[in-house]
């Protein structure tokens, strides 16, 4: 049975190989896809849980959710955003908490990240996944938060 991975944010789909960070583009942490978030309005938006499961790791700029079958999805909010020390992010959940797909996990402002000189792109990674098992949405397509971003066989 395949796992449907929802987009944590609304925006435009980007191939992981086009993410301007070698850790992600080189698939060092795993295969996946990315989304350039829609920063319209410049306000805070919620980054959603891409799957139902347990939050196994959470930081202000990133989180991992593991489902009951042991599949883990990493959502990383922007590049080099760890350098912000949590500024611009509001964590809404905690490690060990069970969440349903589509539940808000972190509020953040992609426009604020961008105005600070950082890239707000959001890599969504299948940790310990095989690229051949993933079917990501095609690049350059618009995706809404909560819509299917990729499937993991």
PLM features: residue spans?
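Contiguous, well-folded functional domains in the mature portion of proteins
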Residues: 1-153
């Amino acid at each position: 049975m395949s796992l449907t991975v929802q987009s944590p944010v609304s925006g435009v789909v980007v191939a992981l190989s086009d993410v301007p960070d070698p850790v992600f583009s080189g698939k060092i942490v795993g295969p996946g896809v990315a989304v350039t978030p829609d920063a319209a309005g410049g306000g805070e938006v919620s980054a959603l849980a891409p799957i139902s499961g347990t939050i196994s790791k959470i930081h202000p700029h990133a989180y991992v959710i593991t489902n009951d079958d042991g599949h883990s999805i990493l959502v990383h909010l922007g590049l080099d955003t760890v350098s912000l020390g949590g500024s611009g992010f509001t964590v809404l959940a905690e490690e060990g908490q069970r969440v349903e797909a589509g539940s808000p996990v972190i509020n953040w402002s992609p426009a604020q990240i961008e105005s600070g000189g950082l890239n707000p792109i959001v890599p969504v990674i299948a940790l310990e996944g095989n690229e051949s098992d993933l079917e990501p949405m095609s690049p350059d397509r618009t995706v809404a938060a909560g819509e299917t971003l990729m499937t993991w066989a």
